[in-house]
């Protein structure tokens, strides 16, 4: 395919917006300045109380490819769904309104690799922006060459490295999403993790770019970093949605047992950490939330299956093997207070930052 033919492929960029006046200019400028010009940029405003709509309207008046629409106020997942239904592009890119693209050629690189490999999803590396410092995240090269059906690919892709979990930093083939009717579920947060797991279960073909294609601004006010009392319910809702999706697509549930187990371990750890921070480092608060996970029938089944598993975990990192086995055993035997102490130690040593 020639360069001209590739430029004929349209990319739809979908951006949910809520109170993003501080960063939205930088976000839009990084997209407008892309060397790849066949774009439509759809911004869905979710009832911003600041000047975000005014700023976007000025861009909209200047750039015909920019379109702002009114959202339902139900969160980023619903906004992305609205954008997906309006999108006319051959490919989809999601971005958050407080992040930006550091490479003006990243869309060209996405398209080139997608067309060369016939990939459904092209994944780039990313970096975090934290207190004015760029911190490169763990790169996906450690699992990119693994078979997508392997435990290593799933574990690193969605958890220890985590690159596959996020909606951003990727190029999606719209036809793939449309054919499989993949949309964002109605969740309080982590809807992008479920979205990408649904893509994975539908046997998406992946291609990986070594380039850093996205800068994620770590924002303590983001939903992802805030304490939520409904968090346990949200994670179990995600798991139930995932199990329903596996059944809907006529997949063997046994193939995804470890995926669900890992998901619940990471969810329980994350919620334990948030309870610890929210309640002045109270071990009893952590114990209480771990008990919620261990008492849920689906959680108990998942932790017990991982703890009783005879086959060795097909994960290369020994530390992760030890942590997964220890956590699942602790949850199986209801050692909630002991597990709470373990979470305290990991948070104190800042190991938790690698799990976020």
State each model region's role.
Residues 45-54, 73:
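A conserved acidic beta->alpha catalytic loop
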Residues 276-356:
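Membrane-interface aromatic/basic loop that binds lipid-linked glycans or pyrophosphate carriers
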Residues 92:
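Short aromatic/hydrophobic "clamp" motif used to bind/position activated sugar donors
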Residues 19-33:
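Short, well-formed alpha-helical segments that are part of the catalytic scaffolds
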Residues 76, 97-209, 214-230:
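Donor-binding/catalytic cores of nucleotide-activated saccharide
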Residues 211-220, 225-254, 259, 270, ...:
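Catalytic core of nucleotide-sugar-dependent glycosyltransferases
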Residues 8-11, 32-43, 51, 63-67:
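Short loop->beta transition adjacent to catalytic acidic/histidine clusters or analogous donor-positioning motifs
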Residues 70-87, 97:
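Glycine-rich, basic loop-to-helix element that forms the pyrophosphate-binding segment
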């Amino acid at each position: 395919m020639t360069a001209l033919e590739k430029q004929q492929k349209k990319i739809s960029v979908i951006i949910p917006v809520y109170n993003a006046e501080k960063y939205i200019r930088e976000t839009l400028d990084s997209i407008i300045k892309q060397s790849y010009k066949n774009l439509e940029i759809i911004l869905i405003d979710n009832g911003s109380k600041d000047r975000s709509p005014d700023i976007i309207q000025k861009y909209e008046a200047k750039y015909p490819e920019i379109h702002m629409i009114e959202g339902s106020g139900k969160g980023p997942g619903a906004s992305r769904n609205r954008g997906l239904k309006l999108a006319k592009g051959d490919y989809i890119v999601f971005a958050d309104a407080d992040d930006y693209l550091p490479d003006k050629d990243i869309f060209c690189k996405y398209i080139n690799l997608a067309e060369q490999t016939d990939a459904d999803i092209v994944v780039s590396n990313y970096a975090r922006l934290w207190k004015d410092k760029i911190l490169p995240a763990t790169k996906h090269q450690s699992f990119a060459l693994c078979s997508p059906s392997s435990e290593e690919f799933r574990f690193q892709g969605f958890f220890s490295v985590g690159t596959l979990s996020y909606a951003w930093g990727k190029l999606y083939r719209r036809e793939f999403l449309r054919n499989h009717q993949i949309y964002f579920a109605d969740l309080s947060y982590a809807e992008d993790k479920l979205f990408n797991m649904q893509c994975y279960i539908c046997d998406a073909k992946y291609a990986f770019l070594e380039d850093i294609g996205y800068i994620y601004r770590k924002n303590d006010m983001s939903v992802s970093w805030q304490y939520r009392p409904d968090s346990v319910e949200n994670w179990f809702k995600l798991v139930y949605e995932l199990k329903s999706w596996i059944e809907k697509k006529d997949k063997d549930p046994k193939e995804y047992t470890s995926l669900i187990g890992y998901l619940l371990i990471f969810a329980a750890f994350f919620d334990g950490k948030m309870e610890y921070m929210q309640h002045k480092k109270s071990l009893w608060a952590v114990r209480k939330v771990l008990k919620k996970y261990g008492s849920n029938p689906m959680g108990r089944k998942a932790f017990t299956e991982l703890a009783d598993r005879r086959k060795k975990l097909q994960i290369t990192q020994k530390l992760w093997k030890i942590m997964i086995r220890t956590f699942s055993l602790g949850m199986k035997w209801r050692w909630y207070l002991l597990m709470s102490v373990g979470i305290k130690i990991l948070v104190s040593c800042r190991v938790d930052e690698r799990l976020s």
